[in-house]
Curated annotation (Swiss-Prot):
The lineage of its organism: Bacteria, Pseudomonadati, Pseudomonadota, Gammaproteobacteria, Enterobacterales. Can catalyze the hydrolysis of ATP in the presence of single-stranded DNA, the ATP-dependent uptake of single-stranded DNA by duplex DNA, and the ATP-dependent hybridization of homologous single-stranded DNAs. It interacts with LexA causing its activation and leading to its autocatalytic cleavage. ATP binds at G67, P68, E69, S70, S71, G72, K73, T74. The gene is recA. This is Protein RecA. Keywords: ATP-binding, Cytoplasm, DNA damage, DNA recombination, DNA repair, DNA-binding, Nucleotide-binding, SOS response. Its main location: cytoplasm.
């Protein structure tokens, strides 16, 4: 629809004044000189990258990962760090729980010599460190473990048993307002790990909630609910966890999708097992009885041997990964674009699954 000529001149003058006062790019037309595709970092799980719709977690956004104890929250974030470092990105880990195990992180592929780590004394200090790292523009991924451990200074300095109603929620709300814009400008991914609490007196619906108030729920572009749904066994020995992740909120693609994968103790996400399962499902790997074949060549009898073949032949694993991503993430040759900003918390559910 054509705009009246006088209005057009007035708009051009207003835009010129805004850009002069606040800098170039402070206002622009949505489709002008910018990619609608969101840059992402892999989660280390192919099925979760596919469930997220854009190939991973979005840069320049806030992400929340929550779930019960020992469900794989920290493992998942360490896999994100490992994936980011392989791309040459700088990462920081804000260890508010004072529980990061560098030996375990190294086993998951994290370059601990180049990982920035902070163990802050108070919640305010942790969030100020996040803000300073973001404003530097030099850090690409920041992990905060966890929101529940971000204790306000007043609570630390007070007596045990003192009431500090809403202090943490106010602190988080103020931090979100300050961080959201800076993260976008710096193109920094900020991941908050969160814990689950129970609401008292809930008769109907899900009694579970996350700590730190509601601000994080609104500011997060992606919220992931991670659960342990079973054990991975070799004979009678438990060697890992069957894990399910639900995309509870997603502003970059369609939400409510699920991914299931294995987390092996001491190794992290069983990415090769995912490649075999998805390869068979999408007919890239042929399965005849117990034998698995790829491109006409047998790669192993039984899933474990097929996984070992991919471990010993990383070039084949990389090729299969690329083929699966091209098939499942691309539509008409273009990556899924950020066209789903309309999804918000009104549509959000956090029911247990």
């Amino acid at each position: 629809m054509a705009i009246d000529e006088n209005k057009q001149k007035a708009l051009a003058a207003a835009l010129g004044q805004i850009e002069k006062q606040f800098g170039k790019g402070s206002i622009m037309r949505l489709g002008e000189d910018r990619s609608m595709d969101v840059e992402t970092i892999s989660t280390g799980s192919l099925s979760l990258d596919i469930a997220l719709g854009a190939g991973g977690l979005p840069m320049g956004r806030i992400v929340e990962i929550y779930g019960p104890e020992s469900s794989g929250k920290t493992t998942l974030t360490l896999q994100v760090i490992a994936a980011a470092q392989r791309e040459g990105k700088t990462c920081a880990f804000i260890d508010a729980e004072h529980a990061l195990d560098p030996i375990y992180a190294k086993k998951l592929g994290v370059d601990i010599d180049n990982l920035l780590c902070s163990q802050p004394d108070t919640g305010e200090q942790a969030l100020e460190i996040c803000d300073a790292l973001t404003r530097s523009g030099a850090v690409d991924v920041i992990i905060v473990d966890s929101v529940a451990a971000l204790t306000p200074k007043a609570e630390i300095e007070g007596e045990i048993g003192d009431s500090h109603m809403g202090l943490a929620a106010r602190m988080m709300s103020q931090a979100m307002r300050k961080l959201a814009g800076n993260l976008k400008n710096a193109n920094t991914l900020l991941i908050f790990i969160n814990q689950i609490r129970m609401k008292i007196g809930v008769m109907f619906g899900n009694p579970e909630t996350t700590t730190g108030g509601n601000a994080l729920k609104f500011y997060a572009s992606v919220r992931l609910d991670i659960r342990r749904i079973g054990a991975v066994k070799e004979g009678d020995e438990v060697v890992g966890s069957e894990t399910r992740v639900k995309v509870v909120k997603n502003k970059i693609a369609a939400p409510f999708k699920q991914a299931e994968f294995q987390i092996l103790y001491g190794e992290g996400i069983n990415s090769r097992g995912e490649l075999v399962d998805l390869g068979v499902k999408h007919k890239m790997i042929e399965k005849a009885g117990a034998w698995y074949s790829y491109n006409g060549d047998k790669i192993g009898q039984g899933k474990a041997n097929a996984c070992n073949f991919l471990k010993e032949n990383p070039a084949v694993a990389a090729e299969l990964d690329k083929r699966l991503r091209d098939l499942l993430l691309h539509s008409n040759g273009e990556l899924v674009a950020a066209t789903n900003e309309g999804f918000d918390d009104e549509a959000e559910t956090s029911e247990e699954f």
